[in-house]
Amino acid sequence: MNFLSIFVLIPLLMLAGLWAAQGIKAIRGVMVTGASTLLIASIVLTFMYLGERSAGNTAEMLFRADTLWYAPLHISYSVGVDGISVAMLLLSAIIVFTGTFASWRLQPLTKEYFLWFTLLSMGVFGFFISIDLFTMFMFYEIALIPMYLLIGVWGSGRKEYAAMKLTLMLMGGSAFLLIGILGIYFGSGATTMNLLEIAQLHNIPFAQQCIWFPLTFLGFGVLGALFPFHTWSPDGHASAPTAVSMLHAGVLMKLGGYGCFRIAMYLMPEAANELSWIFLILTGISVVYGAFSACVQTDLKYINAYSSVSHCGLVLFAILMLNQTAATGAILQMLSHGLMTALFFALIGMIYGRTHTRDVRELAGLMKIMPFLSVCYVIAGLANLGLPGLSGFIAEMTIFVGSFQNNDVFHRTLTIIACSSIVITAVYILRLVGKILYGTCTNKHHLTLTDATWDERVAVICLIACVAGLGMAPFWISHMIGESVLPVVSQLIP
Protein backbone atom coordinates (compact mmCIF):
# COMPACT_ATOMS: atom_id res chain seq x y z
CA MET A 1 0.00 0.00 0.00
CA ASN A 2 1.21 3.49 -0.85
CA PHE A 3 2.28 5.43 2.27
CA LEU A 4 0.06 8.41 1.37
CA SER A 5 -3.07 6.27 1.54
CA ILE A 6 -2.50 6.11 5.31
CA PHE A 7 -3.95 9.62 5.50
CA VAL A 8 -7.28 8.30 4.21
CA LEU A 9 -7.10 4.87 5.83
CA ILE A 10 -6.52 6.14 9.39
CA PRO A 11 -9.64 8.38 9.39
CA LEU A 12 -11.64 5.44 7.99
CA LEU A 13 -10.40 3.26 10.86
CA MET A 14 -11.22 6.07 13.28
CA LEU A 15 -14.77 6.19 11.92
CA ALA A 16 -15.13 2.44 12.44
CA GLY A 17 -13.65 2.69 15.94
CA LEU A 18 -15.92 5.57 16.90
CA TRP A 19 -18.96 3.71 15.59
CA ALA A 20 -18.12 0.73 17.80
CA ALA A 21 -16.97 2.73 20.85
CA GLN A 22 -19.15 2.74 23.94
CA GLY A 23 -18.64 5.40 26.59
CA ILE A 24 -16.82 8.70 26.64
CA LYS A 25 -13.44 7.19 27.56
CA ALA A 26 -13.49 4.83 24.58
CA ILE A 27 -14.49 7.65 22.22
CA ARG A 28 -11.68 9.87 23.51
CA GLY A 29 -9.25 6.96 23.23
CA VAL A 30 -10.11 6.38 19.57
CA MET A 31 -9.76 10.08 18.75
CA VAL A 32 -6.45 10.57 20.57
CA THR A 33 -4.97 7.41 19.05
CA GLY A 34 -6.09 8.33 15.54
CA ALA A 35 -5.10 12.00 15.75
CA SER A 36 -1.70 11.10 17.23
CA THR A 37 -1.09 8.53 14.49
CA LEU A 38 -1.95 11.10 11.81
CA LEU A 39 0.43 13.60 13.39
CA ILE A 40 3.25 11.05 13.56
CA ALA A 41 2.56 9.97 9.96
CA SER A 42 2.74 13.59 8.76
CA ILE A 43 6.05 14.13 10.56
CA VAL A 44 7.45 10.89 9.11
CA LEU A 45 6.27 11.94 5.64
CA THR A 46 8.02 15.30 6.03
CA PHE A 47 11.34 13.61 6.82
CA MET A 48 10.81 11.08 4.02
CA TYR A 49 10.19 13.91 1.57
CA LEU A 50 13.22 15.91 2.69
CA GLY A 51 15.33 12.75 2.49
CA GLU A 52 14.23 12.07 -1.08
CA ARG A 53 15.04 15.63 -2.13
CA SER A 54 18.43 15.47 -0.40
CA ALA A 55 19.14 12.24 -2.28
CA GLY A 56 18.62 14.07 -5.57
CA ASN A 57 15.08 13.00 -6.48
CA THR A 58 13.84 15.84 -8.70
CA ALA A 59 10.42 14.43 -9.62
CA GLU A 60 7.69 17.05 -9.38
CA MET A 61 5.55 14.77 -7.19
CA LEU A 62 6.94 12.08 -4.89
CA PHE A 63 5.43 8.83 -3.54
CA ARG A 64 3.02 8.62 -6.47
CA ALA A 65 0.47 5.87 -6.93
CA ASP A 66 -2.19 5.51 -9.63
CA THR A 67 -5.11 3.09 -9.54
CA LEU A 68 -7.79 3.23 -12.24
CA TRP A 69 -11.12 3.73 -10.54
CA TYR A 70 -13.71 4.43 -13.27
CA ALA A 71 -12.51 3.71 -16.81
CA PRO A 72 -15.28 5.41 -18.89
CA LEU A 73 -14.32 8.84 -17.49
CA HIS A 74 -10.63 8.02 -16.94
CA ILE A 75 -10.98 8.68 -13.22
CA SER A 76 -8.15 7.30 -11.09
CA TYR A 77 -7.22 7.25 -7.45
CA SER A 78 -3.99 9.16 -8.05
CA VAL A 79 -1.92 10.44 -5.16
CA GLY A 80 1.40 12.24 -4.82
CA VAL A 81 2.96 15.05 -2.83
CA ASP A 82 5.37 17.92 -3.24
CA GLY A 83 6.60 20.37 -0.62
CA ILE A 84 3.33 22.31 -0.63
CA SER A 85 1.22 19.20 -0.04
CA VAL A 86 3.55 17.96 2.71
CA ALA A 87 3.30 21.32 4.49
CA MET A 88 -0.51 21.29 4.26
CA LEU A 89 -0.71 17.70 5.53
CA LEU A 90 1.48 18.62 8.50
CA LEU A 91 -0.72 21.65 9.25
CA SER A 92 -3.88 19.55 9.01
CA ALA A 93 -2.51 16.87 11.34
CA ILE A 94 -1.47 19.46 13.94
CA ILE A 95 -4.91 21.07 13.97
CA VAL A 96 -6.79 17.75 14.06
CA PHE A 97 -4.61 16.72 17.01
CA THR A 98 -5.07 19.97 18.93
CA GLY A 99 -8.75 20.18 17.95
CA THR A 100 -9.30 16.78 19.55
CA PHE A 101 -8.07 18.09 22.89
CA ALA A 102 -10.02 21.33 22.45
CA SER A 103 -13.18 19.17 22.16
CA TRP A 104 -12.23 16.92 25.08
CA ARG A 105 -15.18 17.89 27.27
CA LEU A 106 -17.75 18.46 24.52
CA GLN A 107 -21.27 17.30 25.42
CA PRO A 108 -23.80 16.06 24.30
CA LEU A 109 -23.72 13.61 21.34
CA THR A 110 -19.96 13.27 21.65
CA LYS A 111 -19.72 10.19 19.43
CA GLU A 112 -21.75 11.76 16.61
CA TYR A 113 -19.72 14.97 16.83
CA PHE A 114 -16.40 13.15 16.48
CA LEU A 115 -17.76 11.00 13.63
CA TRP A 116 -18.51 14.10 11.56
CA PHE A 117 -15.30 15.81 12.68
CA THR A 118 -13.30 12.77 11.50
CA LEU A 119 -15.13 12.67 8.16
CA LEU A 120 -14.28 16.35 7.67
CA SER A 121 -10.65 15.58 8.47
CA MET A 122 -10.59 12.70 5.98
CA GLY A 123 -11.83 14.99 3.23
CA VAL A 124 -9.08 17.50 3.97
CA PHE A 125 -6.30 14.89 4.00
CA GLY A 126 -7.62 13.23 0.85
CA PHE A 127 -7.74 16.55 -0.98
CA PHE A 128 -4.12 17.40 -0.23
CA ILE A 129 -2.74 14.03 -1.38
CA SER A 130 -4.84 13.80 -4.58
CA ILE A 131 -3.49 14.70 -8.02
CA ASP A 132 -6.55 13.54 -9.99
CA LEU A 133 -9.02 16.36 -10.61
CA PHE A 134 -12.13 14.31 -9.94
CA THR A 135 -10.70 12.69 -6.81
CA MET A 136 -9.71 16.14 -5.53
CA PHE A 137 -13.25 17.36 -6.13
CA MET A 138 -14.70 14.31 -4.38
CA PHE A 139 -12.60 14.84 -1.25
CA TYR A 140 -13.36 18.58 -1.44
CA GLU A 141 -17.08 17.78 -1.21
CA ILE A 142 -16.50 15.26 1.60
CA ALA A 143 -14.80 18.05 3.56
CA LEU A 144 -17.67 20.50 3.02
CA ILE A 145 -20.71 18.34 3.78
CA PRO A 146 -20.02 17.70 7.52
CA MET A 147 -19.80 21.44 8.19
CA TYR A 148 -23.58 21.81 7.97
CA LEU A 149 -24.24 19.33 10.78
CA LEU A 150 -21.24 20.31 12.90
CA ILE A 151 -22.43 23.92 12.98
CA GLY A 152 -26.19 23.30 12.84
CA VAL A 153 -26.24 20.76 15.69
CA TRP A 154 -23.28 21.61 17.94
CA GLY A 155 -22.95 25.32 17.19
CA SER A 156 -24.21 28.33 19.12
CA GLY A 157 -26.12 31.54 18.42
CA ARG A 158 -27.77 31.64 14.99
CA LYS A 159 -26.34 28.24 14.19
CA GLU A 160 -29.06 27.04 11.78
CA TYR A 161 -28.84 30.25 9.75
CA ALA A 162 -25.03 30.17 9.70
CA ALA A 163 -24.93 26.48 8.73
CA MET A 164 -27.39 26.95 5.87
CA LYS A 165 -25.68 30.11 4.61
CA LEU A 166 -22.26 28.44 4.68
CA THR A 167 -23.54 25.33 2.92
CA LEU A 168 -25.41 27.17 0.18
CA MET A 169 -22.53 29.53 -0.62
CA LEU A 170 -19.87 26.81 -0.61
CA MET A 171 -22.03 24.50 -2.71
CA GLY A 172 -22.53 27.37 -5.14
CA GLY A 173 -18.75 27.65 -5.35
CA SER A 174 -18.57 23.89 -5.89
CA ALA A 175 -20.89 24.21 -8.88
CA PHE A 176 -18.50 26.75 -10.47
CA LEU A 177 -15.62 24.46 -9.63
CA LEU A 178 -17.18 21.35 -11.17
CA ILE A 179 -17.94 23.20 -14.41
CA GLY A 180 -14.36 24.49 -14.46
CA ILE A 181 -12.87 21.03 -13.87
CA LEU A 182 -14.97 19.47 -16.64
CA GLY A 183 -14.01 22.33 -18.94
CA ILE A 184 -10.32 21.75 -18.20
CA TYR A 185 -10.63 18.01 -18.84
CA PHE A 186 -12.48 18.25 -22.15
CA GLY A 187 -10.60 21.36 -23.28
CA SER A 188 -7.22 19.73 -22.75
CA GLY A 189 -8.06 16.69 -24.86
CA ALA A 190 -6.42 14.55 -22.19
CA THR A 191 -7.20 10.88 -21.69
CA THR A 192 -6.84 11.24 -17.94
CA MET A 193 -7.85 13.63 -15.16
CA ASN A 194 -4.35 13.57 -13.69
CA LEU A 195 -3.43 17.23 -13.29
CA LEU A 196 0.29 16.59 -13.95
CA GLU A 197 -0.46 15.01 -17.32
CA ILE A 198 -2.89 17.80 -18.23
CA ALA A 199 -0.21 20.35 -17.31
CA GLN A 200 2.35 18.54 -19.48
CA LEU A 201 -0.01 18.55 -22.47
CA HIS A 202 -0.50 22.30 -22.00
CA ASN A 203 -2.97 22.53 -24.87
CA ILE A 204 -6.13 24.11 -23.47
CA PRO A 205 -7.02 26.83 -26.02
CA PHE A 206 -6.59 30.36 -24.69
CA ALA A 207 -10.23 31.26 -25.39
CA GLN A 208 -11.36 28.30 -23.28
CA GLN A 209 -8.86 29.13 -20.54
CA CYS A 210 -10.47 32.57 -20.25
CA ILE A 211 -13.77 30.82 -19.48
CA TRP A 212 -12.59 28.01 -17.20
CA PHE A 213 -10.00 30.00 -15.24
CA PRO A 214 -12.47 32.50 -13.69
CA LEU A 215 -14.91 29.70 -12.85
CA THR A 216 -12.22 27.57 -11.21
CA PHE A 217 -10.64 30.49 -9.36
CA LEU A 218 -14.02 31.70 -8.11
CA GLY A 219 -15.02 28.16 -7.13
CA PHE A 220 -12.00 27.83 -4.88
CA GLY A 221 -12.01 31.54 -4.03
CA VAL A 222 -15.41 31.27 -2.33
CA LEU A 223 -13.87 28.84 0.17
CA GLY A 224 -10.90 31.19 0.52
CA ALA A 225 -13.30 34.02 1.53
CA LEU A 226 -12.67 36.05 -1.63
CA PHE A 227 -14.55 39.36 -1.66
CA PRO A 228 -17.53 39.64 -2.23
CA PHE A 229 -18.17 35.93 -1.55
CA HIS A 230 -16.80 36.06 2.00
CA THR A 231 -20.01 36.68 3.95
CA TRP A 232 -20.53 33.02 4.90
CA SER A 233 -17.22 32.97 6.75
CA PRO A 234 -17.81 35.28 9.76
CA ASP A 235 -21.25 33.80 10.49
CA GLY A 236 -19.92 30.26 10.11
CA HIS A 237 -16.94 30.88 12.39
CA ALA A 238 -19.02 32.63 15.03
CA SER A 239 -21.56 29.81 15.28
CA ALA A 240 -19.24 26.80 14.99
CA PRO A 241 -17.96 24.77 17.97
CA THR A 242 -14.37 25.51 18.98
CA ALA A 243 -12.59 22.63 17.22
CA VAL A 244 -14.71 23.09 14.09
CA SER A 245 -13.73 26.77 13.96
CA MET A 246 -10.11 25.69 14.36
CA LEU A 247 -10.28 23.18 11.51
CA HIS A 248 -12.49 25.40 9.38
CA ALA A 249 -10.32 28.52 9.50
CA GLY A 250 -7.04 26.71 10.04
CA VAL A 251 -7.30 24.13 7.26
CA LEU A 252 -10.57 24.11 5.31
CA MET A 253 -10.16 27.68 4.04
CA LYS A 254 -6.66 26.72 2.89
CA LEU A 255 -8.23 24.33 0.39
CA GLY A 256 -9.30 27.47 -1.45
CA GLY A 257 -5.81 28.94 -1.81
CA TYR A 258 -4.27 25.53 -2.52
CA GLY A 259 -6.83 24.79 -5.25
CA CYS A 260 -6.41 28.20 -6.88
CA PHE A 261 -2.66 27.66 -7.09
CA ARG A 262 -2.58 23.94 -7.88
CA ILE A 263 -5.40 23.84 -10.45
CA ALA A 264 -6.42 27.28 -11.74
CA MET A 265 -2.96 28.86 -12.00
CA TYR A 266 -1.05 25.69 -12.92
CA LEU A 267 -3.32 24.36 -15.65
CA MET A 268 -4.33 27.69 -17.22
CA PRO A 269 -1.25 29.94 -17.01
CA GLU A 270 -2.06 32.12 -20.03
CA ALA A 271 -5.48 33.04 -18.65
CA ALA A 272 -3.90 33.60 -15.23
CA ASN A 273 -1.51 36.12 -16.77
CA GLU A 274 -4.29 37.83 -18.69
CA LEU A 275 -6.96 37.98 -15.98
CA SER A 276 -4.97 38.13 -12.75
CA TRP A 277 -5.46 41.90 -12.44
CA ILE A 278 -9.22 41.47 -11.92
CA PHE A 279 -8.77 39.05 -9.05
CA LEU A 280 -5.88 41.09 -7.63
CA ILE A 281 -8.29 43.97 -7.10
CA LEU A 282 -10.79 41.66 -5.38
CA THR A 283 -8.12 40.14 -3.14
CA GLY A 284 -6.76 43.59 -2.30
CA ILE A 285 -10.25 44.58 -1.17
CA SER A 286 -10.47 41.38 0.91
CA VAL A 287 -7.21 42.21 2.69
CA VAL A 288 -8.14 45.76 3.67
CA TYR A 289 -11.90 45.26 4.11
CA GLY A 290 -11.39 42.25 6.39
CA ALA A 291 -8.96 44.19 8.60
CA PHE A 292 -11.22 47.26 8.84
CA SER A 293 -14.26 45.07 9.59
CA ALA A 294 -12.38 43.37 12.43
CA CYS A 295 -11.81 46.80 13.99
CA VAL A 296 -15.53 47.48 14.48
CA GLN A 297 -16.63 44.07 15.80
CA THR A 298 -17.44 43.44 19.45
CA ASP A 299 -17.69 39.63 19.32
CA LEU A 300 -14.35 37.83 19.79
CA LYS A 301 -15.16 35.23 17.15
CA TYR A 302 -16.31 37.82 14.61
CA ILE A 303 -13.07 39.74 15.14
CA ASN A 304 -11.02 36.65 14.39
CA ALA A 305 -13.31 35.68 11.50
CA TYR A 306 -12.85 39.01 9.73
CA SER A 307 -9.14 38.82 10.49
CA SER A 308 -9.18 35.48 8.66
CA VAL A 309 -10.86 37.11 5.66
CA SER A 310 -7.98 39.59 5.56
CA HIS A 311 -5.22 37.01 5.97
CA CYS A 312 -6.73 34.54 3.49
CA GLY A 313 -7.15 37.42 1.05
CA LEU A 314 -3.42 37.99 1.41
CA VAL A 315 -2.81 34.36 0.37
CA LEU A 316 -4.74 34.78 -2.89
CA PHE A 317 -3.18 38.22 -3.39
CA ALA A 318 0.32 36.72 -3.26
CA ILE A 319 -0.55 33.81 -5.55
CA LEU A 320 -1.71 36.28 -8.21
CA MET A 321 1.61 38.15 -8.14
CA LEU A 322 2.98 35.38 -10.39
CA ASN A 323 6.48 35.07 -8.96
CA GLN A 324 8.29 32.52 -6.82
CA THR A 325 8.93 34.70 -3.77
CA ALA A 326 5.32 35.83 -3.42
CA ALA A 327 4.00 32.31 -4.05
CA THR A 328 6.33 30.92 -1.38
CA GLY A 329 5.04 33.62 0.97
CA ALA A 330 1.47 32.60 0.15
CA ILE A 331 2.07 29.01 1.26
CA LEU A 332 3.92 30.21 4.37
CA GLN A 333 0.95 32.47 5.11
CA MET A 334 -1.40 29.50 4.76
CA LEU A 335 0.68 27.65 7.35
CA SER A 336 1.10 30.64 9.63
CA HIS A 337 -2.52 31.73 9.53
CA GLY A 338 -3.71 28.15 9.98
CA LEU A 339 -1.74 27.84 13.21
CA MET A 340 -2.52 31.36 14.48
CA THR A 341 -6.24 31.27 13.84
CA ALA A 342 -6.56 27.78 15.32
CA LEU A 343 -4.82 29.11 18.43
CA PHE A 344 -7.12 32.14 18.55
CA PHE A 345 -10.31 30.11 18.16
CA ALA A 346 -9.13 27.59 20.76
CA LEU A 347 -8.49 30.38 23.28
CA ILE A 348 -11.77 32.13 22.47
CA GLY A 349 -13.64 28.87 22.99
CA MET A 350 -11.92 28.34 26.35
CA ILE A 351 -12.70 31.89 27.49
CA TYR A 352 -16.32 31.57 26.33
CA GLY A 353 -16.69 28.23 28.09
CA ARG A 354 -15.91 29.97 31.38
CA THR A 355 -17.44 33.43 30.98
CA HIS A 356 -20.37 32.48 28.68
CA THR A 357 -19.83 35.64 26.69
CA ARG A 358 -17.76 36.67 23.68
CA ASP A 359 -18.70 40.34 23.90
CA VAL A 360 -15.58 42.47 24.30
CA ARG A 361 -17.58 45.03 26.29
CA GLU A 362 -18.38 42.46 28.98
CA LEU A 363 -14.82 41.23 29.49
CA ALA A 364 -11.98 42.86 31.45
CA GLY A 365 -9.15 41.99 33.81
CA LEU A 366 -8.76 38.38 32.65
CA MET A 367 -4.97 38.47 33.09
CA LYS A 368 -5.34 38.24 36.88
CA ILE A 369 -8.09 35.63 36.71
CA MET A 370 -6.77 33.33 33.95
CA PRO A 371 -3.06 34.14 33.55
CA PHE A 372 -2.17 31.11 31.40
CA LEU A 373 -4.94 31.66 28.86
CA SER A 374 -4.32 35.42 28.89
CA VAL A 375 -0.58 35.14 28.20
CA CYS A 376 -1.33 32.68 25.39
CA TYR A 377 -3.85 35.16 23.96
CA VAL A 378 -1.17 37.87 23.96
CA ILE A 379 1.20 35.53 22.08
CA ALA A 380 -1.51 34.75 19.52
CA GLY A 381 -2.18 38.46 19.07
CA LEU A 382 1.51 39.28 18.59
CA ALA A 383 1.81 36.52 15.99
CA ASN A 384 -1.25 37.88 14.20
CA LEU A 385 0.13 41.40 13.95
CA GLY A 386 3.48 40.12 12.65
CA LEU A 387 5.93 40.27 15.56
CA PRO A 388 9.43 39.14 14.43
CA GLY A 389 10.25 35.70 15.76
CA LEU A 390 6.70 34.42 15.27
CA SER A 391 5.20 32.88 12.14
CA GLY A 392 3.17 35.89 10.99
CA PHE A 393 6.24 38.06 10.39
CA ILE A 394 8.15 35.75 8.06
CA ALA A 395 5.04 34.92 6.01
CA GLU A 396 3.88 38.50 5.49
CA MET A 397 7.36 39.85 4.81
CA THR A 398 7.94 37.18 2.14
CA ILE A 399 4.63 38.10 0.51
CA PHE A 400 5.27 41.84 0.46
CA VAL A 401 8.88 41.49 -0.73
CA GLY A 402 7.72 39.15 -3.50
CA SER A 403 4.83 41.41 -4.46
CA PHE A 404 7.12 44.43 -4.71
CA GLN A 405 9.30 42.56 -7.22
CA ASN A 406 6.66 43.39 -9.82
CA ASN A 407 7.98 46.80 -10.75
CA ASP A 408 4.93 48.24 -12.52
CA VAL A 409 2.75 50.92 -10.94
CA PHE A 410 -0.39 48.77 -10.71
CA HIS A 411 1.16 45.92 -8.72
CA ARG A 412 3.20 48.18 -6.46
CA THR A 413 0.20 50.39 -5.69
CA LEU A 414 -1.87 47.37 -4.71
CA THR A 415 1.02 46.06 -2.60
CA ILE A 416 1.27 49.35 -0.69
CA ILE A 417 -2.49 49.29 -0.08
CA ALA A 418 -2.28 45.68 1.14
CA CYS A 419 0.60 46.63 3.45
CA SER A 420 -1.74 49.02 5.26
CA SER A 421 -3.47 45.95 6.69
CA ILE A 422 -0.46 45.49 9.00
CA VAL A 423 -1.24 48.79 10.74
CA ILE A 424 -4.97 48.07 10.88
CA THR A 425 -4.30 44.62 12.35
CA ALA A 426 -2.15 46.17 15.07
CA VAL A 427 -5.01 48.53 15.94
CA TYR A 428 -7.64 45.88 16.59
CA ILE A 429 -5.26 43.36 18.21
CA LEU A 430 -3.75 45.84 20.68
CA ARG A 431 -7.17 47.35 21.47
CA LEU A 432 -8.56 43.87 22.07
CA VAL A 433 -5.71 42.73 24.30
CA GLY A 434 -5.89 45.91 26.37
CA LYS A 435 -9.66 45.72 26.78
CA ILE A 436 -10.24 42.10 27.77
CA LEU A 437 -7.01 41.21 29.58
CA TYR A 438 -6.27 44.34 31.58
CA GLY A 439 -8.28 46.85 33.56
CA THR A 440 -10.66 45.98 36.38
CA CYS A 441 -13.04 43.05 36.20
CA THR A 442 -16.54 44.33 37.02
CA ASN A 443 -18.37 41.01 36.80
CA LYS A 444 -18.18 39.28 40.19
CA HIS A 445 -18.93 35.88 38.62
CA HIS A 446 -15.76 36.14 36.52
CA LEU A 447 -13.60 36.55 39.64
CA THR A 448 -14.11 32.90 40.62
CA LEU A 449 -13.25 31.41 37.22
CA THR A 450 -10.47 28.84 36.85
CA ASP A 451 -7.57 28.79 34.42
CA ALA A 452 -6.89 26.22 31.68
CA THR A 453 -7.30 22.50 32.30
CA TRP A 454 -4.61 19.97 31.31
CA ASP A 455 -6.28 19.07 28.00
CA GLU A 456 -6.64 22.73 27.06
CA ARG A 457 -2.98 23.33 27.90
CA VAL A 458 -1.92 20.48 25.59
CA ALA A 459 -3.79 22.03 22.65
CA VAL A 460 -2.58 25.59 23.29
CA ILE A 461 1.07 24.75 24.03
CA CYS A 462 1.29 22.62 20.86
CA LEU A 463 0.00 25.47 18.69
CA ILE A 464 2.23 28.10 20.32
CA ALA A 465 5.27 25.86 19.85
CA CYS A 466 4.45 25.54 16.14
CA VAL A 467 3.88 29.29 15.72
CA ALA A 468 7.20 30.05 17.41
CA GLY A 469 9.02 27.25 15.60
CA LEU A 470 7.91 28.43 12.17
CA GLY A 471 8.81 32.02 13.05
CA MET A 472 12.29 31.30 14.41
CA ALA A 473 13.37 28.51 12.04
CA PRO A 474 11.52 29.07 8.75
CA PHE A 475 14.32 28.20 6.31
CA TRP A 476 13.82 24.44 6.00
CA ILE A 477 10.13 24.71 5.24
CA SER A 478 10.43 27.82 3.05
CA HIS A 479 13.10 26.04 1.00
CA MET A 480 10.87 22.98 0.66
CA ILE A 481 7.95 25.15 -0.44
CA GLY A 482 10.06 27.35 -2.74
CA GLU A 483 11.24 24.35 -4.75
CA SER A 484 7.67 23.14 -5.15
CA VAL A 485 6.14 26.41 -6.33
CA LEU A 486 8.72 26.73 -9.10
CA PRO A 487 7.04 24.33 -11.61
CA VAL A 488 3.83 26.35 -11.35
CA VAL A 489 5.43 29.79 -11.37
CA SER A 490 7.71 28.93 -14.31
CA GLN A 491 4.60 28.49 -16.46
CA LEU A 492 3.12 31.77 -15.25
CA ILE A 493 6.06 33.96 -16.27
CA PRO A 494 5.02 35.61 -19.56
Which residue stretches match the model-derived regions?
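Cytoplasmic/organellar membrane-interface segments at the starts of transmembrane helices
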Residues: M370-F372, I429-P494
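Cytoplasmic juxtamembrane regions at transmembrane-helix boundaries
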Residues: F101-W116, T242, G250, H445-D455
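Transmembrane helix-loop-helix hairpins at membrane boundaries of multipass inner-membrane proteins
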Residues: N2-F3, L18-F101, R105-L115, N194, ...
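Hydrophobic transmembrane alpha-helices and their helix-loop junctions in integral membrane proteins
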Residues: T98-W104, M122-F134, M147-K435
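Alpha-helical transmembrane segments and their helix-start/interface "positive-inside/aromatic belt" motifs
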Residues: K25-S36, Y161-M171, M370-V375, T453-C462
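Membrane-interface helix-loop-helix modules in multi-pass inner-membrane proteins
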Residues: M61-A87, L133-M136, Y140-Y148, L385, ...
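Hydrophobic alpha-helical membrane-insertion segments
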Residues: T33-L50, L170-I181, L373, Y377-L385, ...
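Central hydrophobic cores of alpha-helical transmembrane segments in multi-pass inner-membrane proteins
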Residues: S5-A20, V32-L45, L89-S103, L120-M122, ...
